[in-house]
Amino acid sequence: MSERMQYIRNFCIIAHIDHGKSTLADRLIEKTGFLSERETDKQILDNLELERERGITIKLKPVRMIYKAKDGNEYELNLIDTPGHVDFTYEVSRSIAACEGALLVVDATQGIEAQTLANVYMALEHDLEIVPVINKIDLPSANPEHVKKEIEDVIGIDAEDALLTSAKEGIGIEEVLEAIVNRIPPPKGDENKPLKALIFDSFYDNYKGAISFVRVVDGIVKPGMRIKMFSTGKVFEVTEVGMFRPNLYPVEELKAGEVGYIAASIKNVKDTRVGDTITDADNPADFPLPGYKEVVPMVFCGIYPADGQDYENLKEALEKLQLNDASLVFEPDTSAALGFGFRCGFLGLLHMEIVQERLEREYNLNLVTTAPSVIYKVYKTNGEVLDLDNPTKMPPPTQIDHIEEPIVEATIMVPTEYVGAVMELCQDRRGAYLGMEYLEQTRVLLKYEMPLNEIIYDFFDALKSRTRGYASFDYELKGYKESNLVKLDILINGELVDALSMIVHKDKAYEKARKIVEKLKENIPRHLFEIPIQAAIGSKIIARETVKALRKNVLAKCYGGDVTRKKKLLEKQKEGKKRMRQVGSVEIPQEAFMSILKLDDEK
């Protein structure tokens, strides 16, 4: 190992939302002199406006700091930021793979949460040295001793010498830097071997093209070299390499053990895939770094412009977002009810919400979205297998042998008094109980196997409202399982509205259908003729509501008189309404679509 590498430390910070990760990062950067005090109020690493607002980290931003330690040497510290949310699990695993150590930041007032657990286990799998940091000790309700014990009990790492800090007040920051230097091992690697570099993120720059954030494992990379991507085999010529001081700062070369960026006029972010290995095209390494996998979208939904003329703008906006977000997939889609739009695939619910919010905010678009759906495997009677991401493409029931749906293993951490409510919720959502363990007297870890279909809707909101926000939740895909699923169609005035079709479990179909038709009845305005709203499975109608017609009082002119006269007028009116119903078209307002997405909120 070279002399130079002994002075490099690559680390990440693992923390639950709001446990103070970004603030701690700011303090470390400030302490090593890269920022003036003035710049420190704004969280350096969270670039997107949305990130700051929701207090979550979505796009990663690494940063390099130079720290003069107490032993008199200067160390290069590379902080690789990790997104904390479950949708971005794969991105987290790649960030973790680029490090040798991790700071585990736990809030002194709250203790460990489910997402932290998932990420810590991932870090332990990658053999990272974990340094526990107990943050927010300045708060009156802080209980650091209790949290230390919890870290030892739950994760099983020694928390005796956990560091006590308050990032907000700047307490204990020096100790954290010393611990990074003394407890986290230097990187291993050999700069004389062929180049191997792990891509842990990428973003798109209008001038330089797609820029890959890399951790160089072996070898050296410098401008003018030809590099090859392992997963696609494409070759590019390096135009610039550099470090992060949070902003891009070009250097002459990146060597083994270092973290930096590579620009090679790559036109598309899809060519710099997270987790891929970059090697020297002229002297390639024999095999790539382990752990690369294609990112597969889990949740799909249709996105349509509320105003049909915005279609081109929506397309452009999605293309721009895709430049920076290779995990977003979309294809054109048409719906009889909503016109032209796109079928988009996302990593998870949060990802979907963020993309929708960014489209509405940054591109001023007014959107209609359909209910989210997952990918089902449909086994047909002729032996074909379909991957179904859109309920409207489901084959007729006679051609289906059976359907499988994706299953996840959910880990829920919850205070003991809410266990009953959470278990009830999971059972409600077709969850299969796997086990529970008490982490301490007051908190329980529940494990359930659940269909992804039941989670993507609003499970997280329901969980939060039943536990007053105290539960935390994480899930991991387990595979596919056969299930009794049917396609629920909604007919309005006898016509199928494709955008409202959904795939549901047979046992829940009736209840769901009832709710939908009632909701639509409230949201569709009365017309001059009556409108039947029906829910059907195949050709069998299982629920119906009718929106009554607006009608004139045709008997107003009749004073007394014969009953046959009245009958004649009423019959005539009825005839007219019937004819009108045959030719009339029903206007379905946007609210009607939106109301169906929010069906379960009222419980």
From Swiss-Prot:
Protein EC: 3.6.5.n1
Sites where the protein binds GTP: 18-23, 135-138
Molecular function GO terms recorded: GTP binding; GTPase activity; ribosome binding; translation elongation factor activity
Cellular compartments annotated: Cell membrane
Class of the enzyme per the UniProt entry, highest EC level: hydrolase
Membrane-topology descriptor: Peripheral membrane protein
Pfam families with a match to the protein in the record: EFG_C, EFG_III, GTP_EFTU, GTP_EFTU_D2, LepA_C
GO biological process: positive regulation of translation
InterPro entries given in the database record: EF-4, EFG_II, EFG_III/V, EFG_V-like, EFTu-like_2, G_TR_CS, LepA_C_sf, LepA_CTD
Residues annotated as domain tr-type G: 6-188
Domain of life, per lineage: Bacteria
Main location: membrane
Catalytic activity: GTP + H2O = GDP + phosphate + H(+)
Coiled-coil blocks: none
Assigned protein family: Belongs to the TRAFAC class translation factor GTPase superfamily. Classic translation factor GTPase family. LepA subfamily.
Job of this protein: Required for accurate and efficient protein synthesis under certain stress conditions. May act as a fidelity factor of the translation reaction, by catalyzing a one-codon backward translocation of tRNAs on improperly translocated ribosomes. Back-translocation proceeds from a post-translocation (POST) complex to a pre-translocation (PRE) complex, thus giving elongation factor G a second chance to translocate the tRNAs correctly. Binds to ribosomes in a GTP-dependent manner.
Listed HAMAP family: LepA (MF_00071)
Name under which the protein is recorded: Elongation factor 4
Organism this protein belongs to: Thermoanaerobacter sp. (strain X514)
Gene: lepA
